[in-house]
Amino acid sequence: RDEEWSVVSKNKDYNAGSQTGENDKSNLATIPDTAKDLGSREALADYSADDLIWYPAEADISIRRRAFNSYGGWFYHKNEMNKGANKLFRVYLNTAGRNASFLLNVPPTKDGVLDADTVKKLKEFGDKLKSLYSNPISFTAYSGSAEKGMAENAAVTALSMDSPSNDFMLPSDEDIIDLKLDKSQKVRYLVLRENLTYSQRVERFDVYVKTLTGRWKKIEACKLIGNKRIVLIGEETTEVRIFVRQSRSNPHFRHIALY
């Protein structure tokens, strides 16, 4: 799935039933785990709040792969190889960077140790993760809307420090957060995290950068944030804009950072 909701139907693991009773919860249609959409408004339209649960996504993957495909077993076999650091990094961006927990299975040999190539691949993967977060870019944050204008917001600037105690609730009359850099430079990634104490709220948002000619360029039309969203930017810019298009009540952010 491209998007992972944490708020899903309780009925998703039950046997399917036809939706014939307006108020009969036992007749609510099952949403199978393999469905493309587990938690959008459309998917949950017939469910009440009592029919929902918090069920975070988990992505399990083995570092091993078979010679002819990328799938490997949970145990060590000599005829299998290890996935490379670039492959593991892409998986990380598409799992941990899209509101899922990334669980990497690393099987030892029959002697109970990790072979040399496994250790090498893990070190290379770890180095790539460190490089992602090793060069934070400072910014001054502004929030507002097209109607009311933009104003400097110290609370949003403070979100660059990733701390569970951080929180900024975007007011009902605001939908834009601008991150103004100290100077023009290349931004590789935008990292966003919601404060999940208040549940998962953001449903759609766009990311823009200001070009060197002063125009706004859309980088990506995104959907969910949740625990973490990593947006690839890869552009030189002086300003990054987050435009919240749709949310379930006011978004609560705990972390906003550029790298």
Where are these regions (language model features)?
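Mature catalytic domains of secreted/periplasmic carbohydrate-active enzymes
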Residues: 1-173, 177-201, 208, 218-232, ...
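Beta-strand signatures of extracellular beta-sandwich domains
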Residues: 206-208, 257
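Extracellular Ig-like/FN3 beta-sandwich strand-entry sites
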Residues: 237-239
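Edge beta-strands of jelly-roll/beta-sandwich modules across compartments, strongly enriched
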Residues: 248-259
